[in-house]
Amino acid sequence: MLVLGIESSCDETGVALYDTERGLLAHQLHTQMAMHAEYGGVVPELASRDHIRRAIPLTEACLSEAGKKLADLDAIAYTQGPGLGGALMVGASMANALAFGLNIPVIPVHHLEGHLLSPLLADPKPEFPFLALLVSGGHTQLMAVRGVGDYEILGETVDDAAGEAFDKTAKLLGLPYPGGPLLSRLAESGSPDRFTLPRPMLHSGNLDMSFSGLKTAVLTLVRQQESAQGELDEQTRMDICRAFQEAIVEVLVKKSLAAMRQAGMKRLVVAGGVGANKQLRAALNDAAARKRFDVFYPPLALCTDNGAMIAFAGAMRLKFAEPAGGFTIKPRWDLSSLPAV
């Protein structure tokens, strides 16, 4: 069964081909990062227009890479939500038009389910059940995953997502958009001992998290340093980046360990863009070695938004249940509302 996946929820256009017998056959991705950098953030209207420009050429490139034709497709999956309404509409329009013309099923996919299942595209693959740490620019959640569609949210951020906190803090430090990845790179050269920032809700007694207060703490620290020395020098900026990243990582790791104890699970799956963070991976790998559990990640290329995860999630939905179909988008969509298969 050959499934075409289309991702267009925000500022990446992703198209991929997944075969249930042979695995991922082709994967094409275009990022709009450079286009939005001029504005310091994602401009929804520009994002939608760029998806329109890119979706068909990327699909053609994907088919060519795999040596396939449209007539070979058995189904088409698309990101139904959550995301930017106009951007989602591009993928939904294309998927439904192609599926109608080819007389094949169309499969709406939850964007976060795509992220959750993306580590199953790696090798070795995690087995159900597992605990998932979903950590991205828009979401930070801890979930018990017992099967496709069987998700229980155990804890989540009560304000900013971890990736959002990275980007906002980078902006406070004067780093160019997108600042989160650059902040992480600068943190690698920062001193681990010079500054210490708070760990919000680390001892809250539940699995929820909070990261908005870290921005305020960084702003206070920046003002203190500027008052003492004038403009921040590069080393001070790197040291602040290090302190910020260490605070985020410690909260994510300790909350994940607590969630695993609560759920009684020995497998941890990390998904989402922040899952590519080197310090987070190192800390989780160290914890896994000490606590004797297994940790799984998607391939680095599939940590960001991509069509491969949508094609795979769509294939799983098609394999185990009738696709919902219908020309709809859901810019706001609770993952826990998905039916299990």
From Swiss-Prot:
Substrate binds at L134, V135, S136, G137, G138, D167, G180, N277. Its EC number is 2.3.1.234. It is found in: Cytoplasm. Required for the formation of a threonylcarbamoyl group on adenosine at position 37 (t(6)A37) in tRNAs that read codons beginning with adenine. Is involved in the transfer of the threonylcarbamoyl moiety of threonylcarbamoyl-AMP (TC-AMP) to the N6 group of A37, together with TsaE and TsaB. TsaD likely plays a direct catalytic role in this reaction. GO terms for cellular component: cytoplasm. Binds 1 Fe(2+) ion per subunit. It catalyses: L-threonylcarbamoyladenylate + adenosine(37) in tRNA = N(6)-L-threonylcarbamoyladenosine(37) in tRNA + AMP + H(+). Fe cation binds at H111, H115, D305. Disulfide bonds: none annotated. Its main location: cytoplasm. Belongs to the KAE1 / TsaD family. One of its GO terms (biological process) is tRNA threonylcarbamoyladenosine modification. The keyword Transferase applies. One of its GO terms (molecular function) is N(6)-L-threonylcarbamoyladenine synthase activity. This is tRNA N6-adenosine threonylcarbamoyltransferase. Gene3D superfamilies: 3.30.420.40. Keywords: Acyltransferase, Cytoplasm, Iron, Metal-binding, Transferase, tRNA processing. It comes from Chromobacterium violaceum (strain ATCC 12472 / DSM 30191 / JCM 1249 / CCUG 213 / NBRC 12614 / NCIMB 9131 / NCTC 9757 / MK). Its cofactor is Fe(2+). PANTHER family: TRNA N6-ADENOSINE THREONYLCARBAMOYLTRANSFERASE, TRNA N6-ADENOSINE THREONYLCARBAMOYLTRANSFERASE, MITOCHONDRIAL.
